[in-house]
Amino acid sequence: CKQIFGIYEGLTNMKFIAEFCQNHNGDFKILERMVAEAAESGATHGKIQTIYSANLAFRPEFENGVMIGEKVLVIKRPYQMEYDRLKKLELSTKESEKFVKLCEKFQIIPMTTCFARENLNEIADVGFGAIKIASYDCASFPMIREIADRFTDIVISTGATYDSEIKKACDILAGCDFELLHCVTQYPTSLNSMNLSRIPWLRQFTPRVGLSDHSLVSRDNVWACKAALYLGATSLERHFTVLPPDKTKDGPVSISSTHLR
Protein backbone atom coordinates (compact mmCIF):
# COMPACT_ATOMS: atom_id res chain seq x y z
CA CYS A 1 0.00 0.00 0.00
CA LYS A 2 1.43 3.39 -1.01
CA GLN A 3 2.50 5.89 1.63
CA ILE A 4 1.89 9.58 0.98
CA PHE A 5 2.64 12.15 3.67
CA GLY A 6 2.87 9.37 6.25
CA ILE A 7 -0.69 8.12 5.62
CA TYR A 8 -1.18 4.54 4.43
CA GLU A 9 -4.78 3.36 4.62
CA GLY A 10 -6.81 3.47 1.42
CA LEU A 11 -4.02 4.88 -0.74
CA THR A 12 -3.55 1.88 -3.02
CA ASN A 13 -4.97 3.78 -6.03
CA MET A 14 -3.82 7.19 -4.88
CA LYS A 15 -2.39 9.57 -7.46
CA PHE A 16 0.32 12.06 -6.51
CA ILE A 17 1.27 14.59 -9.18
CA ALA A 18 4.68 16.19 -8.68
CA GLU A 19 4.25 19.52 -10.48
CA PHE A 20 7.71 20.53 -11.67
CA CYS A 21 6.26 23.71 -13.24
CA GLN A 22 9.08 26.19 -13.83
CA ASN A 23 11.19 25.02 -10.89
CA HIS A 24 13.76 23.62 -13.32
CA ASN A 25 14.73 27.20 -14.30
CA GLY A 26 15.10 26.04 -17.90
CA ASP A 27 17.90 23.63 -16.96
CA PHE A 28 17.19 20.05 -18.04
CA LYS A 29 19.78 18.69 -15.60
CA ILE A 30 17.71 20.10 -12.74
CA LEU A 31 14.58 18.57 -14.26
CA GLU A 32 16.33 15.17 -14.36
CA ARG A 33 17.02 15.46 -10.62
CA MET A 34 13.40 16.39 -9.99
CA VAL A 35 12.07 13.33 -11.82
CA ALA A 36 14.43 10.99 -9.97
CA GLU A 37 13.73 12.43 -6.51
CA ALA A 38 9.97 12.66 -7.03
CA ALA A 39 9.78 9.06 -8.23
CA GLU A 40 11.94 7.78 -5.38
CA SER A 41 9.75 9.67 -2.88
CA GLY A 42 6.44 8.16 -3.99
CA ALA A 43 5.10 10.36 -6.80
CA THR A 44 2.97 8.57 -9.40
CA HIS A 45 3.07 11.38 -12.00
CA GLY A 46 5.71 13.89 -13.03
CA LYS A 47 4.32 17.02 -14.65
CA ILE A 48 5.82 19.83 -16.69
CA GLN A 49 4.10 22.70 -18.51
CA THR A 50 3.92 23.01 -22.28
CA ILE A 51 4.08 26.78 -22.37
CA TYR A 52 5.79 29.09 -24.83
CA SER A 53 6.48 32.80 -24.73
CA ALA A 54 5.04 33.07 -28.26
CA ASN A 55 1.61 32.17 -26.84
CA LEU A 56 1.67 35.02 -24.32
CA ALA A 57 -1.07 37.58 -24.95
CA PHE A 58 -0.53 41.32 -24.39
CA ARG A 59 -3.09 42.75 -21.97
CA PRO A 60 -2.84 46.46 -21.18
CA GLU A 61 -4.22 46.11 -17.65
CA PHE A 62 -1.26 43.93 -16.65
CA GLU A 63 1.31 46.60 -17.53
CA ASN A 64 0.72 48.54 -14.31
CA GLY A 65 -1.86 46.38 -12.54
CA VAL A 66 -5.16 47.59 -11.12
CA MET A 67 -5.77 48.41 -7.46
CA ILE A 68 -8.99 49.32 -5.67
CA GLY A 69 -7.85 50.78 -2.37
CA GLU A 70 -5.54 48.14 -0.94
CA LYS A 71 -7.13 45.32 -2.93
CA VAL A 72 -5.33 43.98 -6.00
CA LEU A 73 -7.87 43.66 -8.81
CA VAL A 74 -5.30 42.89 -11.54
CA ILE A 75 -1.72 41.90 -10.78
CA LYS A 76 1.16 43.86 -12.27
CA ARG A 77 2.87 41.67 -14.88
CA PRO A 78 4.35 43.71 -17.75
CA TYR A 79 4.31 41.86 -21.06
CA GLN A 80 7.98 42.19 -22.01
CA MET A 81 9.26 41.11 -18.60
CA GLU A 82 6.96 38.08 -18.59
CA TYR A 83 7.89 37.22 -22.18
CA ASP A 84 11.60 37.30 -21.34
CA ARG A 85 11.05 35.23 -18.19
CA LEU A 86 9.08 32.53 -20.01
CA LYS A 87 11.56 32.44 -22.89
CA LYS A 88 14.34 31.37 -20.53
CA LEU A 89 12.17 28.58 -19.10
CA GLU A 90 11.01 26.98 -22.34
CA LEU A 91 11.68 23.30 -22.95
CA SER A 92 12.17 22.21 -26.55
CA THR A 93 10.21 19.39 -28.15
CA LYS A 94 13.30 17.20 -27.91
CA GLU A 95 13.60 17.97 -24.20
CA SER A 96 9.93 17.07 -23.73
CA GLU A 97 10.61 13.75 -25.45
CA LYS A 98 13.58 13.17 -23.12
CA PHE A 99 11.34 14.03 -20.16
CA VAL A 100 8.74 11.44 -21.21
CA LYS A 101 11.41 8.74 -21.56
CA LEU A 102 12.94 9.74 -18.22
CA CYS A 103 9.58 9.41 -16.44
CA GLU A 104 9.07 6.01 -18.04
CA LYS A 105 12.54 4.96 -16.86
CA PHE A 106 11.59 5.87 -13.28
CA GLN A 107 8.15 4.28 -13.68
CA ILE A 108 6.06 7.39 -13.19
CA ILE A 109 3.51 8.74 -15.64
CA PRO A 110 4.68 11.72 -17.74
CA MET A 111 2.15 14.54 -17.68
CA THR A 112 1.94 18.10 -18.98
CA THR A 113 -0.35 21.11 -18.79
CA CYS A 114 -1.47 22.48 -22.13
CA PHE A 115 -1.86 26.26 -22.26
CA ALA A 116 -2.62 26.64 -25.97
CA ARG A 117 -4.76 24.54 -28.27
CA GLU A 118 -2.17 24.79 -31.03
CA ASN A 119 0.26 22.77 -28.89
CA LEU A 120 -1.95 19.68 -28.65
CA ASN A 121 -0.36 18.03 -31.69
CA GLU A 122 3.09 18.35 -30.12
CA ILE A 123 1.86 16.98 -26.79
CA ALA A 124 0.24 13.98 -28.47
CA ASP A 125 3.27 13.29 -30.66
CA VAL A 126 5.72 13.47 -27.76
CA GLY A 127 3.78 10.73 -25.97
CA PHE A 128 2.57 12.20 -22.69
CA GLY A 129 0.58 9.64 -20.70
CA ALA A 130 -1.69 12.24 -19.10
CA ILE A 131 -2.72 15.83 -19.69
CA LYS A 132 -3.89 18.59 -17.36
CA ILE A 133 -6.22 21.47 -18.14
CA ALA A 134 -5.29 24.49 -16.01
CA SER A 135 -7.84 26.41 -13.95
CA TYR A 136 -7.89 29.35 -16.33
CA ASP A 137 -8.73 26.98 -19.20
CA CYS A 138 -11.61 25.21 -17.48
CA ALA A 139 -13.84 27.39 -19.68
CA SER A 140 -11.75 26.93 -22.85
CA PHE A 141 -14.41 24.63 -24.24
CA PRO A 142 -13.06 24.17 -27.81
CA MET A 143 -9.71 23.04 -26.38
CA ILE A 144 -11.44 20.74 -23.87
CA ARG A 145 -13.45 19.13 -26.70
CA GLU A 146 -10.27 18.42 -28.63
CA ILE A 147 -8.54 17.03 -25.54
CA ALA A 148 -11.55 14.78 -24.89
CA ASP A 149 -11.21 13.37 -28.41
CA ARG A 150 -7.45 12.81 -28.24
CA PHE A 151 -6.41 11.91 -24.68
CA THR A 152 -7.48 9.20 -22.27
CA ASP A 153 -6.11 10.40 -18.89
CA ILE A 154 -7.35 13.94 -18.21
CA VAL A 155 -7.12 16.12 -15.10
CA ILE A 156 -8.89 19.47 -14.95
CA SER A 157 -8.30 22.13 -12.29
CA THR A 158 -11.21 24.23 -11.07
CA GLY A 159 -9.70 27.35 -9.49
CA ALA A 160 -10.93 30.75 -10.75
CA THR A 161 -13.87 28.99 -12.40
CA TYR A 162 -17.62 29.50 -12.14
CA ASP A 163 -19.72 26.49 -11.16
CA SER A 164 -21.59 26.68 -14.47
CA GLU A 165 -18.26 26.46 -16.32
CA ILE A 166 -17.23 23.40 -14.32
CA LYS A 167 -20.53 21.72 -15.18
CA LYS A 168 -20.15 22.47 -18.89
CA ALA A 169 -16.56 21.22 -18.93
CA CYS A 170 -17.66 17.99 -17.23
CA ASP A 171 -20.51 17.58 -19.71
CA ILE A 172 -17.95 17.79 -22.53
CA LEU A 173 -15.74 15.23 -20.77
CA ALA A 174 -18.60 12.80 -20.07
CA GLY A 175 -17.49 9.35 -21.12
CA CYS A 176 -13.80 10.24 -20.69
CA ASP A 177 -11.46 9.12 -17.94
CA PHE A 178 -11.13 12.46 -16.14
CA GLU A 179 -10.54 13.82 -12.66
CA LEU A 180 -11.28 17.21 -11.11
CA LEU A 181 -8.87 19.07 -8.87
CA HIS A 182 -10.15 21.53 -6.29
CA CYS A 183 -7.83 24.52 -6.44
CA VAL A 184 -7.61 28.04 -5.05
CA THR A 185 -5.66 30.23 -7.46
CA GLN A 186 -3.93 32.26 -4.79
CA TYR A 187 -0.17 32.03 -4.28
CA PRO A 188 0.24 31.20 -1.48
CA THR A 189 -3.17 29.99 -0.29
CA SER A 190 -3.78 30.34 3.44
CA LEU A 191 -5.35 27.37 5.23
CA ASN A 192 -8.34 29.59 6.06
CA SER A 193 -8.90 30.14 2.33
CA MET A 194 -8.45 26.51 1.28
CA ASN A 195 -12.21 25.77 1.17
CA LEU A 196 -11.75 22.00 1.19
CA SER A 197 -15.51 21.47 1.43
CA ARG A 198 -15.46 21.88 -2.35
CA ILE A 199 -13.93 18.40 -2.65
CA PRO A 200 -17.13 16.51 -1.69
CA TRP A 201 -19.18 19.10 -3.63
CA LEU A 202 -17.26 18.37 -6.84
CA ARG A 203 -18.12 14.67 -6.57
CA GLN A 204 -21.51 15.39 -8.12
CA PHE A 205 -19.63 15.57 -11.43
CA THR A 206 -17.18 12.67 -11.00
CA PRO A 207 -16.19 10.31 -8.19
CA ARG A 208 -12.54 11.19 -8.80
CA VAL A 209 -11.72 14.50 -7.11
CA GLY A 210 -8.38 15.69 -5.80
CA LEU A 211 -6.59 18.80 -4.53
CA SER A 212 -4.07 21.10 -6.15
CA ASP A 213 -2.44 22.70 -3.12
CA HIS A 214 -0.64 26.06 -3.23
CA SER A 215 -0.20 26.64 0.50
CA LEU A 216 3.01 28.11 1.92
CA VAL A 217 5.24 25.18 2.83
CA SER A 218 7.31 26.98 5.49
CA ARG A 219 4.15 27.99 7.36
CA ASP A 220 1.57 25.30 6.61
CA ASN A 221 3.67 22.24 5.79
CA VAL A 222 1.41 19.68 4.05
CA TRP A 223 -1.61 19.99 6.35
CA ALA A 224 -4.05 20.83 3.56
CA CYS A 225 -3.04 17.73 1.63
CA LYS A 226 -3.51 15.53 4.68
CA ALA A 227 -6.94 17.04 5.34
CA ALA A 228 -7.88 16.46 1.70
CA LEU A 229 -6.96 12.78 2.03
CA TYR A 230 -9.27 12.43 5.01
CA LEU A 231 -12.02 14.02 2.90
CA GLY A 232 -11.53 11.27 0.35
CA ALA A 233 -9.34 13.02 -2.23
CA THR A 234 -8.25 10.57 -4.92
CA SER A 235 -5.27 12.65 -6.01
CA LEU A 236 -2.95 15.38 -4.81
CA GLU A 237 -0.91 17.84 -6.82
CA ARG A 238 1.88 19.94 -5.36
CA HIS A 239 4.67 21.99 -6.82
CA PHE A 240 7.91 20.07 -6.34
CA THR A 241 11.48 21.35 -6.14
CA VAL A 242 15.03 20.15 -5.55
CA LEU A 243 16.32 23.71 -5.05
CA PRO A 244 16.09 26.06 -2.04
CA PRO A 245 12.73 27.92 -1.85
CA ASP A 246 14.27 31.27 -2.84
CA LYS A 247 15.81 29.95 -6.08
CA THR A 248 12.61 29.68 -8.13
CA LYS A 249 9.44 31.72 -8.58
CA ASP A 250 7.23 28.95 -7.17
CA GLY A 251 9.76 27.79 -4.57
CA PRO A 252 7.82 29.00 -1.50
CA VAL A 253 4.77 26.88 -2.43
CA SER A 254 6.84 23.86 -3.48
CA ILE A 255 7.54 20.74 -1.46
CA SER A 256 10.75 18.71 -1.47
CA SER A 257 11.28 14.96 -1.43
CA THR A 258 11.49 15.18 2.37
CA HIS A 259 7.92 16.48 2.58
CA LEU A 260 6.62 13.88 0.14
CA ARG A 261 8.18 10.98 2.02
Functional labels for PLM-detected ranges:
Residues 1-261:
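Catalytic cores and adjacent flexible loops of soluble metabolic enzymes
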